[in-house]
């Protein structure tokens, strides 16, 4: 369930990015942006509901830091979906997040 909450939250963030990119273009782009915005709201809302279920089952001290995976997924999406630059320091930070999530996952 935690993975579902993370994935839906990340999909919502990616849809938000698509939505704001659509606002820059011509009128048909606005309609696509609105579609992306509704998709973002649906993903984020669903992710929130699943997150609430996760909090019923896991300690918040374990569950919340696991959301660090979102930083990893969003960085990968930024790099490979939106062609955004990611420098070495950012990758090192991502590696540290993954080590922390792995350590917490061993406790859960």
Swiss-Prot record:
Protein name: Probable 4-amino-4-deoxy-L-arabinose-phosphoundecaprenol flippase subunit ArnE
Organism ancestry: Bacteria, Pseudomonadati, Pseudomonadota, Gammaproteobacteria, Pseudomonadales
Pathway assigned in UniProt: Bacterial outer membrane biogenesis; lipopolysaccharide biosynthesis
GO molecular function, one term: carbohydrate derivative transmembrane transporter activity
GO terms of biological process kind: lipid A biosynthetic process; lipopolysaccharide biosynthetic process
Gene: arnE
Subunit structure comment from the entry: Heterodimer of ArnE and ArnF.
UniProt-listed SUPFAM superfamilies: Multidrug resistance efflux transporter EmrE
Keywords: Cell inner membrane, Cell membrane, Lipid A biosynthesis, Lipid biosynthesis, Lipid metabolism, Lipopolysaccharide biosynthesis, Membrane, Transmembrane, Transmembrane helix, Transport
Pfam families: EamA
Subcellular location: Cell inner membrane
């Amino acid at each position: 369930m935690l993975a579902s909450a993370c994935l839906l939250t990340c999909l919502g963030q990616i849809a938000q990015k698509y939505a704001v990119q659509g606002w820059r273009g011509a009128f048909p782009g606005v309609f696509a942006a609105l579609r992306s915005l509704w998709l973002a709201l649906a993903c984020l809302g669903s992710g929130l509901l699943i997150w609430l279920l996760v909090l019923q089952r896991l300690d918040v001290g374990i569950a919340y830091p696991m959301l660090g995976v979102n930083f990893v997924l969003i960085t990968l999406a930024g790099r490979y979906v939106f062609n955004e630059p990611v420098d070495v320091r950012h990758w090192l930070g991502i590696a540290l997040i993954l080590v922390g999530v792995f350590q917490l996952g061993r406790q859960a």
